[in-house]
Amino acid sequence: MPKSFIIFLIISALSLTASAQISQTNTDFRFPLDLKPSLSGAFGDLRPNHFHSGLDFRTNQREGYPVYAIADGFVSRMRVQIGGFGQAIYLDHPNGKTSVYAHLCAFHPKIAKLVKDFQYRLESFEVDVPLIFSELPVKKGEIIGWSGNTGSSGGPHLHFEIRDTKTEEALNPQMFGFKVPDVSKPEIRGIYLYQLNGEPFSEDTPKQYFAVKGAAGTYSLATTPVINLSAESAFGIVAFDRHVPAGGTYGLYKIELSLDGENIYTATWNKFSFDANKAINSHLDYAALKKTGMSIQKSFVEPGNALGLYHTQQSGIIKLEDNELHELVYKLSDLAGNTSTFRFKVKRNMSSYASEKSSSLKNYTFNEDFRFNNTDVKLLIPKGALYSPISFEYSLGTKLPGTYSQQHRIHRQNTPLHLPCTLSVKADANLKPELRDKAVLVDQRGVSQGGTFENGFVKSEIKNFGTFHIRVDTIPPKITPMNINDGKTMTGISRIVFKIADQLSGIATFTGKIDGKWILMEYDQKTATLWHRFDEKTLPGKHQLELSVADKKGNTSVYKANFNL
């Protein structure tokens, strides 16, 4: 993909308002849309590899609604991404908060002009422009853009966030008045008992499902009167919230678990750090999620989980010291004040206490670097990459047709990684010198992990454990013109449109030129659509278009056409 650029600048003459002064006492936020508030996503929703960091406001499945500044402030950042937030604006406010407006279809014209100027200056569609000083002030209620579907959006909506300006932590916007009607209590679908017994949590940890019954905020065990616990036990819960009357399911605001009236685990979604956000894969039973699609929220905290959501005793692990009945109580809450309670009885299982042993097989702890090397593989798991110690596993598989190495299984794909690992795989002798710069590591799904050839190995960073081998990418991207051909008259047509695709390593760059001069090509990754909007830079007359698209291994396709405008 085109490079993202960070440019620090001082803008001296551009203002979106006539006001020269921003109130330093304004803390009263308005909604960013003039629509009845309805959410398709809430803060803390469970998403792949992250908690949702804001509110997704519905926009009637349409683009183009005006987006308003929630308070006085100034534009501190303007960003255009191929994925992610797409077109986004960041406003800093005098009260120490930053508001974020993402997936916009268009910026306010003055912001749009500034962004486009930088795109042309840097010859890049993707730009990330932080502003140092308050040279772009805005007033509360001022239009800053229009809602859209850019970036990694799954449909038209406004993604909206509140952040702490200093720490850049994501804050729950509903704590700042951005609430929506909600009269529904959280719903509980079941619980899981985990028998830890001195072992770090893993996908091998024995677990047992217990059905629940109830509704309207009161739940109990469906069939089992008492749950027997082992020496060290913990629980996980399957639950969610609804927003009635809007509909849909959402994340929870708070999960509390108490033992005999004493809190042993609380998770509260007030705020979180983006650096720690991937630890949702520790908050959830990751293996269960991958195998079944079920989101089990663990009520215990692994040692490598750095999310600041939790307050626990003994990390939420239960160690009963007697043979008496004990009561566990789950209390689930949303920010509208709706709560649900689930009470159940537990006691320790003496027979399991006598038979439990620690295997002491864990050979890598999460808080130090770990290296595994043999003649065919080199692996570095950095400190902080795992959430719990593991017994590292490696095995060698058969070679697949059309590949340049054997298959190497690197631990278990259902063990989550918080940080990337560095993996080097030895190439076969049939990887000829002319193919070395085309080599990539490919996982068990056939997805390229990238890679560079170094001293007989192909080296790359991997974000997940799995099975890897070497392939080469020698096929250039495909360019398909959608509304242009050589000699076509484009009068009355607002833009030139292409579809682009790559077979393996992925699109790295695209460059468009008209009459030899760089032009802005915009790209929607979701639809693989690339386009250029005609503007004042292209005058009526005869022109020559050239589009060059390269993949991540340097394979390049070029499309040329003459056209009349």
Question: Where do the PLM segments sit?
Answer:
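Long, low-complexity serine/threonine/glycine- and acidic-rich segments characteristic of extracellular
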Residues: P109, K139, P181, L196-M350, ...
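Proteolytic-maturation and junctional protease-sensitive modules
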Residues: R412-F468, T509-T511, W518-L520
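Surface-exposed, glycine-biased beta-strand/turn segments
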Residues: A20-S99, C105-K110, F125-S134, K139-K140, ...
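Bacterial Sec-dependent N-terminal signal peptides
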Residues: M1-T27
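Proline-enriched interdomain boundary motifs that mark the N-terminal boundary
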Residues: P186-G190, P476-N483
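Short edge beta-strand/loop segments characteristic of extracellular beta-sandwich folds
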Residues: G236-R242, P382, S424-D428, R495-Q503
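Proteolytic processing hotspots in large secreted/extracellular or virion-associated proteins
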Residues: Y353-S359, N363-F366, E393-V440, I484
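Short, solvent-exposed loop/linker segments at the N-terminal edge
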Residues: T218-Y219, P225-S230, T415-P416, D486-G492
